[in-house]
């Protein structure tokens, strides 16, 4: 089972970690300068939950955003098996 949201498709992303020095112009400096850029991993906020989809129980990964949306009930035929 991959670490990917079952409903929204959110998963791990590769993003840039930017290191800067200097003082911002709005604070009276000459501006921020980039001194280094490296790759880093940004993980989705995933939780393993039990859902009922068309009467069948499934244990899946759900993002926090999908859990909030699921509590409102807009996904057709999908509901949390336990409101814990």
Swiss-Prot record:
NCBIfam families, per the entry: L28 (TIGR00009)
Pfam families from the UniProt entry: Ribosomal_L28 (PF00830)
Superkingdom of origin: Bacteria
Keywords for the protein's UniProt record, in alphabetical order: Ribonucleoprotein, Ribosomal protein
GO biological process, one term: translation
Sequence similarity: Belongs to the bacterial ribosomal protein bL28 family.
Protein name, as recorded: Large ribosomal subunit protein bL28
Single GO MF descriptor: structural constituent of ribosome
Species in which this protein is naturally found: Deinococcus geothermalis (strain DSM 11300 / CIP 105573 / AG-3a)
Record's GO cellular component terms: ribonucleoprotein complex; ribosome
HAMAP family per the UniProt record, alphabetical: Ribosomal_bL28 (MF_00373)
PANTHER family in the cross-refs: 50S RIBOSOMAL PROTEIN L28, LARGE RIBOSOMAL SUBUNIT PROTEIN BL28A
Alphabetized InterPro entries for the sequence: Bacterial_rp_bL28 (IPR050096), Ribosomal_bL28 (IPR026569), Ribosomal_bL28/bL31-like_sf (IPR034704), Ribosomal_bL28_bact-type (IPR001383), Ribosomal_bL28_sf (IPR037147)
Gene3D superfamilies, per the entry: Ribosomal protein L28/L24 (2.30.170.40)
């Amino acid at each position: 089972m991959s670490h990917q949201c079952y409903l929204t498709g959110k998963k791990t992303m590769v993003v840039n970690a930017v290191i800067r020095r200097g003082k911002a112009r709005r604070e009276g400096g000459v501006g921020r300068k980039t001194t280094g850029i490296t790759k880093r991993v940004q993980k989705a906020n995933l939780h393993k939950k039990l859902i009922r989809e068309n009467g069948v129980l499934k244990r899946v990964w759900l993002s926090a955003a999908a859990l909030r949306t699921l509590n409102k009930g807009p996904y057709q035929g999908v509901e949390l098996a336990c409101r814990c």
